[in-house]
Amino acid sequence: MDFLKKSLFLVLFLGLVSISLCDEEKRQDDDEASEREEKKEIHEEGNQEERRDRPPSWIPK
């Protein structure tokens, strides 16, 4: 019976550690994704400003 308690405790502990590591990794991925989105938005805003500066008939060569 003591062996079963230790085994169960070990399984639960390792599961908890695994879940916390996955949550941490997920948070990092979310942070990276939001940073990429912000950079993309900034880049798109810059492109829109460039388009406003050019006359509509202007074609780059």
Swiss-Prot record:
Localisation: Secreted
Biased composition, class Basic and acidic residues, residue ranges: 36-55
First and last residue of the signal peptide: 1-22
Gene Ontology BP term (one): defense response
UniProt key word Secreted: yes
List of residues that carry 4-hydroxyproline: P56
GO cellular component, one term: extracellular region
Alphabetical list of InterPro entries matching this protein: Frog_antimicrobial_propeptide (IPR004275)
Keyword field: Amphibian defense peptide, Hydroxylation, Secreted, Signal
Tissue: Expressed by the skin glands.
Disordered, as annotated region: 25-61
One Pfam family recorded for the sequence: FSAP_sig_propep
Propeptide segment residues: 23-53
Family, as annotated: Belongs to the frog skin active peptide (FSAP) family. Tryptophillin subfamily.
UniProt-recorded name of the protein: Tryptophyllin-T1
Species the sequence originates in: Pithecopus azureus
Lineage: Eukaryota, Metazoa, Chordata, Craniata, Vertebrata
